[in-house]
Amino acid sequence: MARDNTEWMGGTQGDFIRPATDGDLNFVRGLSNQVFSVFGEYDEMVPHWISNPECVSAVYIKDGRRPQGFVVLSLAIGEILAIAVIPGSQRSGIGAALLHYMEFLAIQRGLKMLLLHTAQENEAAQAFFGKAGFEVIGDQENYYPKGQTALVMSKAI
């Protein structure tokens, strides 16, 4: 895992974003299974990305102790590989904070653009990424393990 010791404080006292560690793997695996299972077997894939030295990953911590979400960025290609927030905390700014954190790290590493894939039928994710400045640049059929089409989105940073 590419280590970055940068932490960000959240808007609420006790909230912060920190680099993911091996101790976060059970949380990441469980959340991946919960939110990505409609697309395929991501509960093993996402933890693999977190341990990959070509990736940077982070976890949002609430009240100083409870993980609420995570994000993984591939440094090699500038792609957000995964971003997820526990369902009860979605639409509270956690996803946006995680995305901004990765944009900051990407800029520090000299990246000029971020890419991501999101399911064609996932209108909530498309709206979230659109609000963050991402634009659809294409699509990829059968992108997900269960065969769904993904929209490819990018953002200059």
Model-found features: residue ranges?
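Active-site acidic-Proline motif in GNAT/NAT acetyltransferases
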Residues: 86-88, 92, 120-123
